[in-house]
Design a protein with these regions (language model features):
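Long, low-complexity, intrinsically disordered segments
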Residues: 263-289
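Mixed-charge (acidic/basic) macromolecular-recognition segments
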Residues: 147-212, 216
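A surface-exposed partner-binding patch
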Residues: 2-122, 189-257
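Compact, glycine/acidic-enriched structural inserts
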Residues: 122-165
Length: 289
């Protein structure tokens, strides 16, 4: 199919390599663990019409591998399909019916899901059961150039766990790595017992678990719910404030409420290169997406 090119935005191999250097390896300081598992050639045929070329390029570049001592991973969407099915079962997401794939995840199992229509518009927090949509990402996927950008940023602004140890204040995933070692490609750190049964977030409660069966079981024991679309909510509040101040006319809203701001293809509008607060941004897989 080939990369989509635009005179102002080019997301070919050179641009992706720059993002890898400046974002993934530079700003985020997340080098790969080593040589990743090679992505099977049939995956490029299966997903060639699903993911933009930027995603397929990164697959060829890295394979399925972990970054930053296993804090973030590029996942095999076929192997992780049972996990996705378990976490989305019974949840009505605000997007057209489509197949969802896990493309990145963290040491604790926090997942980014890519819809075959809506792109990487869902994040799943397996700790608190939140499935969080992003309508701004889904809307940008209609633009082929922005879709290439979204694909690039999804992998070069890596997803990270958001939870800190309630005693030490340090990232609980980092404490898990220090105590248990780097998790493998088929492993996650899980709380024992799961936090859905109560207790504090503490690194000494973590153990190494087989990722797929553990997360499928966790989906069955953890209350799951659709979270707030933060960018849409923020955009609506910001627009209403401007209307109240008389800065913009009320006609800028629609019958469904004020429109959200344009995030120009950033999966999270996060800090980091390409995000709103990063050195290359206009203001990622970062949890920071």
């Amino acid at each position: 199919m080939g990369f989509v090119r635009d005179e102002d935005l080019e997301w070919g191999p050179e641009g992706i390599e720059e993002r890898i250097r400046e974002g993934l390896l530079g700003y985020h300081d997340m080098p790969p663990l080593g040589v990743g598992r090679v992505v099977p050639e049939e995956y490029f045929e299966r997903f060639g019409g699903v993911f933009p070329e930027s995603v397929l390029y990164i697959w060829r570049r890295f394979g399925f591998v972990g970054f930053g001592q296993g804090r973030s991973w590029i996942t095999d969407p076929v192997e992780w399909a049972p996990v996705v099915d378990a976490w989305l079962e019974g949840i009505e997401v605000p997007f057209p019916p489509q197949r969802w794939h896990c493309v990145t995840r963290t040491a604790l199992g926090y997942m980014r899901l890519w819809g075959e229509i809506s792109g990487p518009a869902l994040k799943v927090d397996v700790i608190d059961g939140t499935i969080r949509p992003s309508s701004s990402v889904a809307g940008d996927m209609a633009d082929p150039v922005l879709a290439e950008r979204i694909g690039c940023i999804t992998f070069t602004s890596p997803l990270e766990d958001l939870y800190d140890d309630e005693v030490s204040g340090r990232p609980v995933a980092v404490e898990g790595i220090e105590r248990l070692g780097v998790p493998g490609a088929a492993e996650v750190f899980g709380f024992v017992p799961p936090l859905s049964f109560g207790g504090r977030i503490s690194g000494d409660r973590l153990s190494v678990q087989k990722a797929v069966p553990y997360l499928v079981g966790l989906a069955q024991s953890t209350p799951r719910y659709l979270g707030v679309d933060l960018m849409a909510a923020w955009g609506g509040a910001a627009t209403q404030f401007l209307i109240d101040q008389g800065a913009i006319p009320n006609s800028t809203g629609t019958s469904d409420g004020p429109s959200a701001p344009d995030t120009v293809g950033d999966p999270d509008n996060q800090d980091g290169p390409g995000g709103s607060g990063g050195p290359a941004g206009s203001g990622g897989f970062g949890g920071g997406l």
